[in-house]
Structures are given as structure tokens and as C-alpha cells.
Amino acid sequence: DKGERDKVMRENGVGYKWDHAYYDGKYYVYFGALPVLMYYMPYKLATEADFSTYAGVFINISVFIIFAVLFVRAVLKRWFKDIPFVSYILLTQVLISSSGIIFAMRKPDLYAMPITMALMFAMAGLYFWISAYECKTKVMQGVRLFVGSLCMALVAGCRPQFLVSSFLAVPLFWNNVFKERTLLSKKSWAHTLVFVLPYVVVAVVVMWYNYARFGSVFDFGANYNLTTNDMTRRGFNIGRMPLGFFTYFLQLPVVYAKFPFVAATNLSNSYMGVTVAEAMFGGIL
């Protein structure tokens, strides 16, 4: 409880690390550890200096944009071959603009790091998955399936909520599994192995990491976060759903006659309770 923490801090003259997970007398970062392993630690070891979070966020965004372009191209090549080039450009712009990276570029802080890295790996994974069966040889098909699954699995080391993107494998590989039998079947055991193995390996590592810190393989530590509210009592409240639906889907953008022409929307509402929300720039629809 933030009120209790602030009271103890005032009475005892001590402080605490804001937005850190506090468990069993120790502080932890509840974000995934992959950004540290990819950027911060190697840079520190190589230069003895601190890595710039801003630089990491922009690297993630740049790679995401590259794979977004390739992803749309792969989708059109596989299912919509007659789409004009202009439509391809427009669809790419829509995907990039609606991904949330514009907000991350506006505020490339520590919170944006795991989110943009998760987006980067998810988009790369989707591209390699879709383009896998464009390859003429089974070896290259297997390589792309493996890389795609590895990228999708690594999302768990960034922002675990983005693992929901892995469920896109169902429509993407529906024909391969149930009609062509080129995946998840006896005759395609090699492709099945390289498709599943990255998930298994990454899951074992992440679960061990969770267990070592919080005593549970499924506990990422978010509930122990020292933030504005008591995360252990936050729970699910149906009263927040209408506001969330309106904000994410129906909220109109605020438009100005000055660059960048849009501003954050007003999240004022009549909900009788605490709502924690980031600034938004309008709903999807």
C-alpha cells in the first residue's frame, strides 16, 4: 500500500526504490531480463559505461519497422498477390502507426524498452513464420520456423503479456497442420521439433528465473511492484471494462494545427475508483 509505505518512510527517514518489485527483503526488476542481456550488460562490460536507454528503444523501433515492412510484404505475397503497390505502402503505414511505437518514440524511457523489444521480436517472429514456407528447400523452411519461434519465445524475456501474439500461429499454420500436414505431424517431425524447441528452452530458462526470485515458475513479480497502488489487491474489476473499451477503440484523437498535430486525449471519467492509465492518442477505430 503506497500510503503505508510513505508513512513508514516519513517516520523512519528511509526511502524505497520506486517501481521495483520488493520480495522477501530484496529488490527486483519485474520487467523481463532480456534487454539487460542484450544491451546493458554487454555495453557495460565492453565500455564500463552505462548504456543509453534512449538508444536501445530507437534500435528496437528501427528493427521493428524493418520487419513490419517485410511482414506486410510476406502477408500480401502469400494471400493477396494482386494488391497494388500503393496499397502495400498504405497498409505498412497503418501497421506501423497503430503499433504504439510513436508513443514510445515520444517517451523512450525505461518502460518503453521492454515493450518495444517485445514488439520487435514479435514482428520478426511473425515475418519468419509467414515466410517460412516460401522457401523452396525444407532446410530453409526449418531454419525460418526455428528463428520465428525463437523470436516469439524471447518475447517472454521482454514483456510476457505480448506472448498472446504467439496465438497467431493458429490461423497462420492452420492449413499446414490440418490440410497439408507439413507441421505437427509424424511426417513433418523435423519441422515440428524446430518449431516447438525454442519455446521449450526459453520457457525453462524464464521459469527457472522466476522460481529463483519469487518461488514460483509463473510469478514474474509484477504483484510486488512498489508503485501508486497495491498491486496484490488490484484484481479484475468489470466496472473498468467500459472505460477501457471506449479508450482503446472509440476515443477520438485531439487534433491541433501545429506539428505533430495530435495530442494526448483526456481520460476524465465517472468511474468511482482508481484507474491507472497512460496517455493515449485516440482509439483504434
How would you label these PLM feature ranges?
Residues 97, 112-114, 120, 150-161, ...:
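Transmembrane helix irregularities
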Residues 1-24, 29, 33, 216-285:
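Membrane-lumen/periplasm interface segments of multi-pass, membrane-embedded glycan/lipid transferases
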Residues 117-137, 146-152, 166-169:
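Specific aromatic-rich, kink-prone transmembrane helix
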Residues 69-100, 120, 136-144:
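Transmembrane-helix signature of polytopic, membrane-embedded enzymes
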Residues 52-81, 124-128:
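Transmembrane-helix motifs of polytopic, lipid-linked glycan transferases
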Residues 15-59, 77-82, 104-108, 264-278:
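Juxtamembrane segments of multi-pass membrane glycosylation machinery
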Residues 165-203:
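Perimembrane helix-loop-helix junctions
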Residues 94-126:
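Membrane-interface micro-motifs in multi-pass membrane enzymes
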